[in-house]
Regions:
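Core segments of cupin and vicinal oxygen chelate
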Residues: 2-96, 131, 139-147, 185-215, ...
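N-terminal beta-strand motif that seeds the catalytic metal site of vicinal oxygen chelate
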Residues: 1-12, 112-115, 163-195, 200-206, ...
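Vicinal oxygen chelate
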Residues: 1-7, 75-79, 88-90, 97, 103-128, 132-185, 207-218, 222-223, ...
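Active-site-adjacent scaffolding segments
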Residues: 30, 78-173
């Protein structure tokens, strides 16, 4: 998953303090002594599936993923070298990749957290999305040697992305404080959502080894009824009330105060630039 932001450096400060993330380029550990920007680490990026990170946990199609869209940030503090704006950063927790922050190339684009779903074949899944009444907004395309990405929307317009891994497998850590915990689809038609996503990700949702980390609920359960259908990324925290205090101190906003769900106690917030996400306590 990744956040599209106008100011990646501001995002670094916000999420770094909120979740304890460090940041760096693709292939860095994120714990190299200068927030991952300037260290010449030989440890690699800690990507799941890399030899340095131990055995990879197999992921079924439909698992939410962290994409591999990070480039080398401009190095700071070198006399005579013009400073380049940071266009993207990969976020790490204890040296393992957990998310990415990407600068928006067009100010008209939404400031948002995007959910990526793992798939072994992005092109085949894109065709099934079209056949199921969805839309492929951005066709599958290579992201260097990291993998293949695509952007899609379901029949109601909720946007999500696809990630076919190459050199970058996805999350190195999840389901622990400071990392991805859940993605909830807020929809106006739960039956239609069940049919669409149930067909796309049947094995991940209903197969013998299914361990889904996303679900769906009516928009009106949490938001005003006129809110468009959308996915909401949840990050795990130890204490949701304490985390809300940190969000406010860092310039973010509480959009929906804590409420109980079937998967934990959640609150919806936004960062200082308006990207919404949820804090989840279990």
């Amino acid at each position: 998953m990744e956040a599209q932001l106008s100011d990646v450096e501001a995002g670094r400060r916000f999420y770094g303090e909120l979740f304890g993330w460090t940041f760096g380029q693709t292939g860095e550990s994120g714990d190299s002594g200068e927030d991952g920007e300037d260290g010449e680490s030989d440890e690699g990026g800690g990507d799941a599936g890399d030899p340095a990170s131990g055995p990879e946990r197999p992921k079924a199609p439909g698992k939410a993923e962290q994409p591999g869209t990070a480039e080398r940030p401009g190095r700071a503090g070198r006399p005579g070298v013009p400073q380049q704006p940071v266009t993207s950063l990969r976020a790490y927790l204890e040296g393992e990749p957990v998310a990415a922050l990407v600068r928006k190339t067009d100010g008209r684009m939404p400031t948002v957290w995007s959910v990526y779903f793992h798939t072994p074949d992005a092109r085949a899944l894109a065709e099934r999305i079209r056949a199921g009444g969805g839309q492929v907004v951005t066709p599958p395309h290579p992201v260097g040697e990291l993998g293949t990405a695509a952007l899609a929307a379901d029949p109601e317009g909720a946007v999500f992305a696809l990630w076919e891994p190459g050199g970058h497998r996805g999350f190195g850590r999840r389901h622990e404080p400071g990392t991805f915990a859940w993605a909830e689809l807020y929809t106006r038609d739960t039956e239609a959502a069940n049919a669409f996503y149930g067909d796309l990700f049947h094995d991940a949702l209903f197969g013998p080894d299914a361990d889904p980390d996303f679900g769906r609920a009516p928009v009106s359960d949490v938001f005003p009824a006129e809110m468009p259908p959308h996915f909401l990324v949840h990050f795990l925290v130890r204490d949701v009330e304490a985390a809300l205090g940190t969000v406010a101190r860092l310039g973010g906003r509480v959009r929906v105060p804590p409420f109980e769900t079937s998967y934990g106690r959640a609150a919806v917030v936004s960062d200082g630039q308006g990207a919404s996400f949820a804090l989840l306590q279990r």
